[in-house]
A protein has these predicted regions:
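Positively charged n-region of N-terminal signal peptides that target proteins for export
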Residues: 1-6
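Hydrophobic alpha-helical
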Residues: 58, 102-121
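Extracytoplasmic "Venus flytrap"
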Residues: 38-61, 65, 76-88, 97, ...
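Flexible loop/hinge segments that line or gate small-molecule binding clefts
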Residues: 114-152
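Hydrophobic membrane-insertion alpha-helices, especially the h-region
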Residues: 8-21
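Ser/Thr/Pro/Gly-rich low-complexity linker/stalk segments immediately outside membranes or between
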Residues: 25-39
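Helix C-cap/helix->beta junction micro-motif
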Residues: 65, 69, 122-124
Length: 153
């Protein structure tokens, strides 16, 4: 049951990332259906068993989605190794690679504003997962989302 909930949770993340991309891309006058969607995923620590399992589920669900929808899903996954500066650099790399969406498992939830500024500058939607950024940061832009459980529960 627990694995099913994890799978469902992260299927929501991957489909949410693609839906975000499509939603905002379709507003552009030069929009055409994508052949691929590139998603940058930065993890606070890949050695964490739970986070590692999340990553594997994301990769599996992306492959399933690719097969059913015919749109190539490119997942760039990086491990920040519990270092916020490393994670910030990874986001820079994702943006330089032209990622359509970034998904972030924050090292330091109070440092999300740096990543948000970078995403806003490039008009790239962001999904934060598992560790919720400070609400003031999430409310700064309509292209920012959090997927995860309420930590108080």
């Amino acid at each position: 049951m627990k694995r099913y909930r994890y799978g469902l949770f992260f299927l929501t993340v991957i489909l949410g990332a693609f839906a975000l991309y499509r939603c905002f891309a379709e507003r552009r006058p030069d929009h055409k259906e994508p052949e691929s969607v590139r998603i940058g995923i930065t993890l606070y620590r890949d050695a964490d068993t739970f986070i590692n399992s999340i990553c594997r589920i994301l990769e599996t669900e992306a492959k399933k989605y690719e097969k059913t929808e015919g749109i190539r899903m490119i997942l760039d996954v990086m491990d920040a190794k519990e270092d916020q500066n490393t994670q910030n650099s990874q986001v820079d790399r994702f943006l330089a690679l032209g990622c359509d969406v970034i998904c972030v498992n924050m090292v330091d939830r109070s440092a999300a504003s740096v990543i948000i500024d970078k995403a806003m500058d490039r008009e790239v939607p962001g999904i934060f997962f598992n560790r919720e950024p400070v609400s003031e940061d999430l409310n700064r832009w309509e292209k920012l989302f959090y997927v995860g459980a309420n930590p108080k529960e």
